[in-house]
Amino acid sequence: MCGIAGIVSNNSSLVQQQKLQLMANALQHRGPDGEGFFINEQQQVGFAHRRLSVIDLSNNAAQPMHYLGRYTITYNGEIYNYLELKLTLQQKGYKFKSASDTEVILAAYDCYQYQCLQYFDGMFAFAIWDNQTQQLFAARDRFGEKPFYYFIDNEQFVFASEMKALWANGIDKSINNTQLINYLSQGFVSNPTSGVTTFYNNISKLPAASYLYYLPTTKQLNVERYWDIDKESKTAITKIHEIQEKFGELLQQSVSRRLRSDVSVGTSLSGGLDSSSIVAIISKLKNPNSSLKTFSATFPGFEKDESKYIREVAARFGIENETTSPTAI
């Protein structure tokens, strides 16, 4: 995971490098491999980025990344189908200087604008400053795997991967009592896929499967949803063996895309059906000369401890397994 943060000023006050640094410091644990900053010529917009290198470890993939002299992005996540999308964009005439998925997002946005989100298979939260239209575009993945918090008032729009980065910028921490009461009485705050409120009065979250445009000249913020589950859709496949084949095909494709990495890959192994199936597929797909590391939590003495199944799966596929036994429960 990476850490992203940014400030867009909508008055005469200038974005300060010092504030961006404080925000980046608050996100250091999210990106140990480096940091980067961007402040535009007018000092109206500033981005901060903490990097965790996964795809294209070179400086060509460093962020914030610039594209076509027009766009600048700070991005957290991974686009699993970036190679397929990159090929499509190359056929349209786009050229790339890096091997990263970050640059693919920028090219896709230039090509499709907000509709680029329909092409992304992945988990992501990012913000793009368009120097030509002088507006900010930000988006979050379909299920909200990657976080995006923001603060807005008459002077600025501030965003970050975590609230603590907003607080580092001086944003107020006053509690949203309504949300707190809802949580204590009902056990939940709001719909996690559609709610924008948080436990803090001045901090909002971009909902899952949503994007926003912010235009500082008019102080206008527009948030739109770009995707939802089609509850009425029905598959044409009705035979059990065909359903099994299609499910296996989709699961293998999904796992395969998540193995795209320029660093070592590991996976959780709980001993259950889901994680064991993923380990089996990875063992089938991986290079025979490479090792697969798995990580497990075991609970000796508990009735539902699955250590036995973890050992069986590890032995069956000849994989490395590291276990830990939490005691503070």
Listing of model-derived features with the role each one plays in the protein:
Residues 1-329:
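Cysteine-centered catalytic environments shared across enzyme families
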